[in-house]
UniProtKB/Swiss-Prot annotation:
Regulation: Allosterically activated by GTP. Inhibited by UTP.
MF terms in GO: ATP binding; UMP kinase activity
Gene (UniProt): pyrH
Name under which the protein is recorded: Uridylate kinase
Location of this chain's protein in the cell: Cytoplasm
Keyword Cytoplasm: yes
Stretches the record annotates as Involved in allosteric activation by GTP: 31-36
Binding site for UMP: G65, D85, T146, G147, N148, P149, Y150, F151, T152, T153
Any one of the GO CC terms: cytoplasm
Length: 249
């Protein structure tokens, strides 16, 4: 449907950002299962995205592929690293198509844009075309990472966020921010309100890999780490009421 434009409101005073990148892991789509996709979970996340889209915010999305195949894990088990990474990229395309179906069932038009050419299921990545989709209020789901092995989907999300002129990256996780120690193991763990890129790197806080953090720092892209399991968590940050950690310069 080349002329489809999702009706919506212009991003106004109720949204802190007009264009954002949402990065979620592939594992977030598998619910309580140990592998693959859990359709009710995919639908729940799609509704979270729809809620933000209804605010008039332009949304870019990158989903990992770890619920299906993880390149590093395959490499550790003896596979050739480049081949394993390409297999991981294909897994992200599968997740992107699943999310596209869930979003469009809710009336949110999307485009899956792949860094690896596969014309039958996704558009090739062309920056100006992708920006035009965003301006038409279509959610752009960027798949297949950067199209190159040895780069994570965190790095791909930061790269696309920079290219798309996003104002912030939202990293959806299982916890509501960055902690000084694992909150699942330590009851006295303290959540940071803000943390710098350099502190993330020096303290190995695990927000994103070093390449992604360095690229975000270079382009002055704030990273919001929040809980994807918290209902309304994504939208609450945009309306100024959410709980999260902000990674800044």
């Amino acid at each position: 449907m080349p002329n489809d434009v999702t009706p919506g409101h212009p991003a106004g005073d109720d949204a802190k950002y007009a264009r954002v990148m949402l990065k979620i892991s592939g594992e977030a789509l598998m619910g309580d299962q140990g592998f693959g996709l859990h359709p009710p979970t995919v639908e729940r996340i799609a509704r979270e995205i729809q809620s933000v889209h209804d605010m008039g915010v332009e949304i870019c999305l990158v989903i990992g592929g770890g619920n299906i195949f993880r390149g590093l894990q395959g490499s550790a088990q003896g596979m050739e690293r480049t081949t394993a990474d390409y297999m991981g990229m294909l897994a992200t395309v599968m997740n992107a198509l699943a999310m596209q179906g869930a979003l469009e069932s809710l009336g949110v038009y999307t485009r899956v844009i792949s860094a690896i050419t596969m014309n039958e299921v996704a558009e090739p990545y062309i920056r100006r075309r992708a920006i035009r989709h965003l301006e038409k209020k279509r959610v752009c789901i960027f798949a297949a990472g950067t199209g190159n092995p040895y780069f994570t989907t965190d790095t791909a999300a930061t790269l696309r966020a920079s290219e798309m002129d996003c104002e912030a990256i939202f990293k959806g996780t299982k916890v509501d921010g960055v902690y000084d120690k694992d909150p699942a193991k330590h009851a006295d763990a303290k959540r940071y309100e803000t943390v710098t890129y350099d502190e993330v790197l020096a303290q190995h806080l695990g927000v994103m890999d070093a390449s992604a953090i360095a690229l975000a720092r270079e382009n002055k892209l704030p990273i919001m780490v929040f809980s994807l399991d918290e209902p309304g968590g994504f939208r609450s940050i945009l309306d100024g009421t959410g709980t999260y950690t902000k990674v800044v310069e």
